[in-house]
């Protein structure tokens, strides 16, 4: 501990408390302000755009100081949290009047980006997650906690790519990682990074902490006991949550394991390329969520986004969702359910604040309003067979609703410290104290009248302020007429203020009554928490059910408004879509969207898609993935009909840009994403590949594109949409069974081009690249020059086209002869020999000898 003897007592206290939390900002309460000193002051001044001043000297040096008013602190905290900062709140807990030295202070809570629960500090319609990651060799454990709902989950990742995908799904507000974590490239761009000591990830400690929290002997009931790496991460996360909240966390009642086998897996590139909740620019406009999310409650909106990012594979559960949506549509219940659900509000987060005992008076009135909707909602859902499963978990809570109706006034003040929250008639003693305090108005009016009459001073009036209490005010012109027993309390420019014994006695009596009323009111407010907490688990289950009902009602409204249909699930591998539409693009276009079919099945697994730039290839592929994903959410889809078979993963390799932060070129990004697909995809995967091989030479790119397509078609047998400008690949259907050509066409006339956007069988005839360049505004002289060059190149190309195709076919035959794609039982001897050879070190004679030797091995 540093020596603080050279400092004043107050600064000693500050520095001692600051030493306990050196890495975060300390808001140190002094009267009506939270003050910051030294480096904290400099940092806060820069981040919050507040004045940096100085406070005297300590240890012979000026002390940098910055401060914010206590009554406006939430706005400043919100800004700091958004910037990824954490703040320790240090309050005065001692009585200034009874303190000989500095008033006793202590840290009452630590506000961090991942543990906030105050509604002013939280993004309303997205989850705010605290996440911890733990690494053991090449495997990873993850834990996530939503402090504002109590949802606590763990998962395990078999490799760095899966970890990246999970972090992309979770989008943590704050991320804890161990000191020995080695994959920093994955997490270094995350806000709110917190490095934690290795011992916090110890398994035994984690299990002990979690059992104590849940009141269990072991974790078998939660199905997580074998997820060791996930539990290690959970232990660190839970310790951090306890450390920052400094109170019990009764709303965290369970922990669950996220199983990859239960969900359709989406890697990080797929989540980004499909623009599920964020567009490619990082905004929320023109995303799938922006189209689908018309939920009337914030908690419903958050749940819908979880469904979007984590589509499920349990067909029974999916059909239940579909049936509920269909029932809501059939009985025309949208207009009945949504007004009631809108009144429910954000019950989930209110309950978290109740659990933490930080709920404000208006939280309790909103909870009361939510509970008041339950009888009507129950009446509606009990009449429909497909909705009755929601009835029991929703509950009614008539007693709690009655408690809140009796206890809290209709429009309470913002904070309990303002008083006037508890309703009249709820508590007799409180009513008595209030009556005494409120009687001051009539008494003061009578006293003012008497004093005017007795003194003859017509400007005399009685007033009150927080500094001087009650006073008698007389104008300066008549102050000389004040009686002798008037004791001067304050002199103003135009008036004098006095006190008399009778008024002082009454002031003491009123202030005592107000103080007693406020103290009793705070006590009663805490007792309301005591009565709510035993029902917390049931209330949380109710809020989850209401959020689900909101999502399903919302999806019904979207299906009706946007003309969606219910997809069918088939046990047969494939994706068949009749007149499918892109759910986002069709909302943005001013002209009608051109719907297109998709047919993928065991006999037609890979479609080679050709056509012009801007012709709609990328849109066609994305809409196929989005329709599939929407089906596995349990919602309806934009098509005339959709039959979806088993899908375990969705991969996309669409578009790319340089990853400057990691020092990777466009081509390197493409190849990294492609490598992930080739390693991870299965026969049940849906794969979208767009323009692979563009970032290198023509022959390199063509070779890579051919090899990737062949691997997908023959080895992986994934359901694949493969868009390309390499027309040489249109011969693939001649080479491999299960492969077909489709194209999108355009019409060119008088230097203009019209894109048809309709998918047709067969290969495209040309790419229309020059017409697109002209549309983009490339100067006509350049276009003219390009056309001349194109004519020359096409003439040369025509002469060698047959030879090029023959070369590709020959290459394919050679690959077959070399058994390049034989079963994974090891490489043959010829390939092993080739791998060991260094051509640069061979003489011509040695090379010829090796060639003969290789010939004998084939």
Curated annotation (Swiss-Prot):
ATP binds at residues 611-618. GO terms for cellular component: cytosol. Gene3D superfamilies: 1.10.1420.10, 6.10.140.430, DNA repair protein MutS, domain I (3.40.1170.10), MutS, connector domain (3.30.420.110), P-loop containing nucleotide triphosphate hydrolases (3.40.50.300). It comes from the Bacteria. GO terms for molecular function: ATP binding; ATP-dependent DNA damage sensor activity; damaged DNA binding; mismatched DNA binding. The keyword Glycosyltransferase does not apply. Keywords: ATP-binding, DNA damage, DNA repair, DNA-binding, Nucleotide-binding. InterPro entries: DNA_mismatch_repair_MutS (IPR005748), DNA_mismatch_repair_MutS-lik_N (IPR007695), DNA_mismatch_repair_MutS/MSH (IPR017261), DNA_mismatch_repair_MutS_C (IPR000432), DNA_mismatch_repair_MutS_clamp (IPR007861), DNA_mismatch_repair_MutS_core (IPR007696), DNA_mismatch_repair_MutS_N (IPR016151), DNA_mismatch_repair_MutS_sf (IPR036187). GO terms for biological process: mismatch repair. Pfam families: MutS_I, MutS_II, MutS_III, MutS_IV, MutS_V. This protein is involved in the repair of mismatches in DNA. It is possible that it carries out the mismatch recognition step. This protein has a weak ATPase activity. Belongs to the DNA mismatch repair MutS family. This is DNA mismatch repair protein MutS. It comes from Actinobacillus succinogenes (strain ATCC 55618 / DSM 22257 / CCUG 43843 / 130Z). The gene is mutS.
